[in-house]
Amino acid sequence: DKPHVNVGTIGHVDHGKILAEGGGAKKYEEIDNAPEERARGITINAAHVEYSTAARHYAHTDCPGHADYVKDPELGVKSVQKLLDAVDTYIPVPTRGTVVTGTLERGDECELLGHNKNIRSLERAEAGDNLGALVRGLVMVKPGSIQPHQKVEAQVYILSKEEGGRFTLRDGNK
């Protein structure tokens, strides 16, 4: 006789949807139980968890975080399809990075700088080569013109609750 609530969880891959939905109510093996899911370490099929509180009964559907699978109507997520459509129209596609293009003159050099990034380098290019650099979290600069830093000293103003800021602070230890 408790009211029934359907909850659908959507989000990007590895952003904690399964953990958030039930605090680990199901073991990983129960959620990602298809061979392909285990091999790739991703959720392809929707996972379902039911639980109750003193006031309500919940049926929670965790949708896969991969755009290739979310829209597939055969996954049994029709109960949240309208929500997905509404979210898709409101939230743009996540950024994939920026592709930098341009002309490097003969003998010009450039550096890609970023924090903790794996950078693959191209030793040389020839006239007529079409080159582009995917620079997500990186900057392309003239060699030696800037240096990356891991520590900075800054003065920070934190918005109060009344100004729209957080009312509980977070730091690296909490």
From Swiss-Prot:
GTP binds at D62, C63, P64, G65, H66. It catalyses: GTP + H2O = GDP + phosphate + H(+). Keywords: Acetylation, Elongation factor, GTP-binding, Hydrolase, Magnesium, Metal-binding, Mitochondrion, Nucleotide-binding, Phosphoprotein, Protein biosynthesis. The modification Phosphothreonine is found at T103. GO terms for molecular function: GTP binding; GTPase activity; magnesium ion binding; translation elongation factor activity. Pfam families: GTP_EFTU. The modification Phosphoserine is found at S121. The modification N6-acetyllysine is found at K161. GO terms for cellular component: mitochondrion. Transmembrane segments: none annotated. The modification N6-succinyllysine is found at K78. The keyword GTP-binding applies. One of its GO terms (biological process) is mitochondrial translational elongation. GTP hydrolase that promotes the GTP-dependent binding of aminoacyl-tRNA to the A-site of ribosomes during protein biosynthesis. This is Elongation factor Tu, mitochondrial. The gene is TUFM.
